[in-house]
Structure formats: structure tokens, C-alpha cells
Design a protein with these regions (language model features):
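Long, amphipathic coiled-coil "stalk"/hairpin helices in large membrane-associated assemblies
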Residues: 3-70, 139, 145-150, 173, ...
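Extended amphipathic alpha-helical segments
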Residues: 9-12, 69, 73-77, 81, ...
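Surface-exposed patches in structured soluble domains
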Residues: 16, 45-48, 130, 137-182, ...
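Acidic, gly/proline-rich low-complexity N-terminal segments at the extreme N terminus
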Residues: 1-18, 118, 182-205, 331-339
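Beta-strand/loop subdomains of soluble extracytoplasmic proteins
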Residues: 10, 169, 176-227, 271-274
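Edge-of-domain interaction segments
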Residues: 240-286, 290-339
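Short beta-strand-turn/beta-hairpin segments enriched in glycine/proline and small hydrophobics
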Residues: 9-35, 122-139, 164-166, 213-216, ...
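Structural microfeature recognizing short secondary-structure transition sites
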Residues: 204-260, 267
Length: 339
């Protein structure tokens, strides 16, 4: 006898782990490479803000000093103009209004001096930025994929120095078959998932992940949509979790919809989308079933049966609807044979 139940659908799919972002790191100032980090090699891992290489900075050390001097001169000129304007304003009080102009009150001169101060401040920021940019740092915790420079190389602005992968976050983009799409939750963002990698032994590496989005389109060839699962710190730098490397082929599993009033039944009991039961007269009755989903060796089905209906576990060779059968007493399973 079977009882209907609620069943949470587990969805599994496969995809490749990739970085959330990659960067072609380029020089922002020109100059000679004078030093580089020993970890700045293909396969090296560096922390956010860690210096990767240094550009000769003599020319850039002087620029902030020159900009500071120019700023001081501009500020002094502004102070002088304001003082002259105050004198002019006092003198204007003794003059007819027709003779008091903006030029007499030195308003244009003050505007010009204020603009000069702002320009000097901007030049100071640029000079300091250029000096800072002689130390090229990692924009995030990164895996060095490739490096194309060495000590003594002269770089121009925009020269690509390396390719980096962000190891703070990884993503698995995986296709979802059409038969799974019907069991997706209403809202996908934030669903907990598990990303696992079979490492070739009996051990399975598993990491927690989150479904963050879908691709928004269907693949024109397969008619599949794609979802994206995100893993924080896939290389385990801060969490000390098992390492999942970029390029690894992984399995993503998560819980989909919960379906109600379904029966779990071994697949071998369903023939031609029918389930066989016995009526009160020990006659075979075929009940049409709706197969909702296949789960391992079982089907989840919907079928119109009563709680006390007897399910036939073993059928005669050629069962017919209404066929009278003999029930074997004491069998562990309900076996029906032709009399």
C-alpha cells in the first residue's frame, strides 16, 4: 500500500568553474621595470593590494614637489588678490557708483586666482597618482595566469603586463535541461547550492555556493537555459576550505520546488504508464499514472488510488484489465498469478 507525500525535487547539473572576472593588467605610467614580486609568476597567488612590480620612480618623485610649489604660489597669489580687493572695496566707498566696476573691485582677478589654485590642486593629485602608480598592485586576491614583462623592460602607458584571475569569487555556469526547468523555484536569486568535484578517489570535494542568476536566454541549439552558481573564495585563501581550481568540471546540486500528493514507486511497477492494483475480487485493474519525475530507480507519480488499494508487485506474463488472478499468500510482496 502506498501513501501520497510531499517531495522536494533535487536538481543536478554540471558546469566548469570560472573566475568572476579576469584582468589584463596594464601599466598606467611609463618607465623601466626595476623590481617584481617573486610570486608574480604564472600560477602564483597574490593578495589584494600586494605589489606585483615596480617602475623606476625618480622622474615621478620630483613631480609632486613641483606641483606642491605651484600650488603654494597659486594660493599666495589668491591671498594677494583678495587683499587688493579689500583695499579696492574700501576705496570704492568714497567714489561715485559709476566709477566702481568689477574690474576696479578686482573680481575677475580673484576668479582667475581661484581657478589657478584649483588647477594646481588637480596637478598635485595627478602627480601623486602617477607616483603611486609606479608601484603596480593586485586589484584583488588574484591568480597570476601569465606574465609578459621582466626586470629591465621599458613599459609605456597601456602596456599589458600580466593576466590575472580573481580568486575571491568563482562562478559555475551550467545548462539546465528542459525537464528540470519545470521544477525551478519561483525566485532563483539566493538559493543555496552545493558544488562538488569528484577528485578521482572515493573522496568528494564539496563547497557551498549560491545560485545568483540565470542567463536570461535559451540556447538556440539545445533549448536549454543556463544558471550561475557563485562560490566565495574557491581557492580557500581565507576560509581554509577545500580548493576548487578554475577549469574544474563540477556538479551543482540544489533544491527545487516541493511537489505535493505524489507517490514514490519503483520504476518496474509502471508499465505503459499504468500501475496495476487488485480489486476486492482479486482481479487486475490498470490505473493510468502521470509520471511527474524520475528519481533514481523510482518514479514520482500521480494516480487515482485509494489508501487501501493493493499494489501488485509481480504480474502475470500477459496481464489484462479485469483478469482474475490468484494471490500468493504469505509472500513478502504481493504476487499475482493466473489461476
Amino acid at each position: 500500500r502506498l501513501k501520497p507525500e510531499s517531495f522536494a525535487i533535487n536538481i543536478e547539473a554540471f558546469g566548469e568553474l570560472a573566475p568572476l572576472e579576469s584582468t589584463r593588467l596594464a601599466a598606467q605610467v611609463s618607465g623601466e621595470v626595476v623590481e617584481w614580486n617573486p610570486k608574480f609568476v604564472a600560477g602564483g597567488i597574490v593578495k589584494r593590494g600586494e605589489t606585483l612590480f615596480s617602475i623606476e620612480k625618480d622622474a615621478y618623485t620630483a613631480a609632486p614637489l613641483q606641483a606642491e610649489s605651484a600650488l603654494a604660489n597659486a594660493q599666495a597669489a589668491l591671498i594677494e588678490e583678495k587683499a587688493l580687493a579689500n583695499v579696492a572695496e574700501r576705496e570704492a566707498a568714497t567714489l561715485p557708483n559709476s566709477r566702481v566696476t568689477d574690474l576696479y573691485l578686482r573680481k575677475p582677478q580673484i576668479l582667475s586666482a581661484e581657478a589657478a589654485v584649483k588647477a594646481a590642486q588637480a596637478q598635485m593629485k595627478i602627480a601623486k597618482r602617477d607616483l603611486d602608480n609606479t608601484e603596480v598592485v593586485a586589484p584583488y586576491d588574484a591568480l597570476i595566469v601569465s606574465r609578459s614583462i621582466g626586470k629591465g623592460d621599458f613599459l609605456t602607458v597601456g602596456t599589458t603586463a600580466a593576466t590575472l584571475y580573481n580568486v575571491e569569487v568563482g562562478e559555475v555556469t551550467f545548462p539546465l535541461a528542459r525537464f528540470d526547468q519545470a521544477f525551478l523555484p519561483e525566485a532563483l536569486d539566493g538559493i543555496d547550492a552545493t558544488v562538488s568535484l569528484l577528485n578521482g578517489t572515493t573522496d568528494e570535494i564539496k563547497r557551498s555556493a549560491t545560485i545568483v542568476r540565470d542567463s536570461g536566454i535559451y540556447d538556440s541549439a539545445t533549448r536549454m537555459t543556463h544558471l550561475v552558481a557563485r562560490i566565495n573564495d574557491p581557492y580557500g585563501l581565507t576560509t581554509q576550505q577545500p580548493v576548487l581550481r578554475f577549469g574544474a568540471y563540477t556538479k551543482v546540486s540544489f533544491t527545487g520546488k516541493t511537489i505535493d500528493n505524489v507517490y514514490r514507486i519503483p520504476q518496474e511497477l509502471i508499465t505503459r504508464r499504468q500501475l496495476w492494483i487488485l480489486d476486492d475480487a482479486d482481479k487486475l485493474v490498470a490505473k493510468p499514472v502521470e509520471v511527474v519525475r524520475e528519481v533514481g530507480s523510482e518514479f514520482l507519480i500521480r494516480v487515482d488510488i485509494a489508501a487501501d488499494d493493493r499494489i501488485v508487485m509481480t504480474l502475470p506474463e500477459y496481464p489484462q484489465n479485469g483478469m482474475a488472478v490468484k494471490v500468493i499468500e504469505g509472500a513478502e510482496k504481493l504476487v499475482a498469478k493466473q489461476p
